[in-house]
């Protein structure tokens, strides 16, 4: 398995393309100059395209991915109704979902042969919309509205329209600020990192009709932490055994172990990392974690070690200015 790591650096308007080898070392293979401040990125389900959100001219760009080395070639673009904060796709590669924090909306862009062709739906009134996350069964779009302490739930119709479910939302505790999400590979649980109180919620997905329950909330910070809480990103290993979340004020990654059924998280430790880690990701082998420092302008690669999933630093690499997003593609 070959793996390519993409790092988005909006301040220098670049995507750095790296080869990740089996020992966890990175080799720079390409630097792409992007027409705008590049922030969120996602790889298409068929691994043929990288979709990128840019500003100040709000657009989604599609780059064709070379199958041999992961190099990028610009292919298409499509306008967006707000500044892109988060970007994702459905599992069949029919639609791109874009959450916009500043605009307070989530939009759906239709794809034809992998290329974005236009917005087909926009839902407004999502104050502080920070991500859009399709459920493993491709039925439900989970959309955290950070400033409203709620996660809105939509069914995605065959033509890409978003239909509010019943119930239409789940709520966090007041002041939590739900932000980013991941799903357990067993498709029974979701995990949401809350930005404003630096906690992680575990949501049990009981059935497709919206019977959803928060079964655990866990503080992700050290006991003696008294500064402003400012959590950012969350990821889970492919085997579902280890979960990670980062806080930008403390510049740390919290390590969680996950119970076998996915219902219970346990804090295992804390990894100091790059300054102001806004984005990180886990590779497809589940052996490595790559974190980007928005203020250090560096990325660090960590090996995921042992039963606890603790992190061991393997190397640091200079990237562009203000790196914010990390995506790993296997090909």
Swiss-Prot record:
Which cysteines are cross-linked by disulfides? none
Q: What class of enzyme is it?
A: hydrolase
The UniProt catalytic activity note for this protein reads: 6-phospho-D-glucono-1,5-lactone + H2O = 6-phospho-D-gluconate + H(+)
Q: Which GO terms describe its cellular component?
A: cytosol
Q: Which residues carry this modification: N6-acetyllysine?
A: 287
Q: Name one GO biological process term.
A: glucose metabolic process
Q: Which domain of life is it from?
A: Bacteria
User: Which pathway does the database say it acts in?
Assistant: Carbohydrate degradation; pentose phosphate pathway; D-ribulose 5-phosphate from D-glucose 6-phosphate (oxidative stage): step 2/3
Q: Which UniProt keywords apply?
A: Acetylation, Carbohydrate metabolism, Glucose metabolism, Hydrolase
- List, alphabetically, the Pfam families matched: Lactonase (PF10282)
Recorded GO terms, molecular function? 6-phosphogluconolactonase activity
Give its E.C. classification number: 3.1.1.31
Role description: Catalyzes the hydrolysis of 6-phosphogluconolactone to 6-phosphogluconate.
Q: Which family does it belong to?
A: Belongs to the cycloisomerase 2 family.
Q: What is this protein called?
A: 6-phosphogluconolactonase
């Amino acid at each position: 398995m070959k793996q390519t790591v993409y790092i988005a650096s909006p301040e220098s308007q670049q995507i750095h393309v790296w080869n990740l080898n089996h020992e966890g070392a990175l080799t720079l293979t390409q630097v792409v100059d992007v027409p705008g401040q590049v922030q969120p990125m996602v790889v298409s389900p068929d691994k043929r395209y990288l979709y990128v959100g840019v500003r100040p001219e709000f657009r989604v760009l599609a780059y064709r991915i070379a199958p041999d080395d992961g190099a990028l070639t610009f292919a298409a673009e499509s306008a967006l109704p707000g500044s892109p904060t988060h970007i994702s796709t459905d599992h069949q590669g029919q639609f791109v979902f874009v959450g916009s924090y500043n605009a307070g909306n989530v939009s759906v862009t239709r794809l034809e042969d992998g290329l974005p062709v236009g917005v087909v739906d926009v839902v407004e009134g999502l104050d502080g919309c920070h991500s859009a996350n399709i459920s493993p069964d491709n039925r439900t779009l989970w959309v955290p509205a950070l400033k409203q302490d709620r996660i809105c739930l939509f069914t995605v119709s065959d033509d890409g329209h978003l239909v509010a479910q019943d119930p239409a939302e789940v709520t966090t505790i007041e002041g939590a600020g739900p932000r980013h999400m991941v799903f357990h590979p067993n498709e029974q649980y979701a995990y949401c990192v809350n930005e404003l109180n630096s906690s992680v919620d575990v949501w049990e997905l009981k059935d497709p009709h919206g019977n959803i329950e928060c079964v655990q909330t866990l503080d992700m910070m050290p006991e003696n932490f008294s500064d402003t809480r400012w959590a950012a990103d969350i990821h889970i290993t492919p085997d579902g055994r280890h979960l990670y979340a980062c806080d930008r004020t403390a510049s740390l990654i919290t390590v969680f172990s996950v119970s076998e059924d996915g219902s219970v998280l346990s804090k295992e430790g804390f990894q100091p990392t790059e300054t102001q880690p806004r984005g990180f990701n886990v590779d497809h082998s589940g052996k490595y974690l790559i974190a980007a420092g928005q203020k250090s302008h560096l990325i660090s690669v960590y090996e995921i070690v042992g039963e606890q999933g603790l992190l061991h630093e393997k190397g640091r690499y200079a990237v562009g200015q203000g790196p914010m997003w990390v995506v790993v593609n296997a090909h």
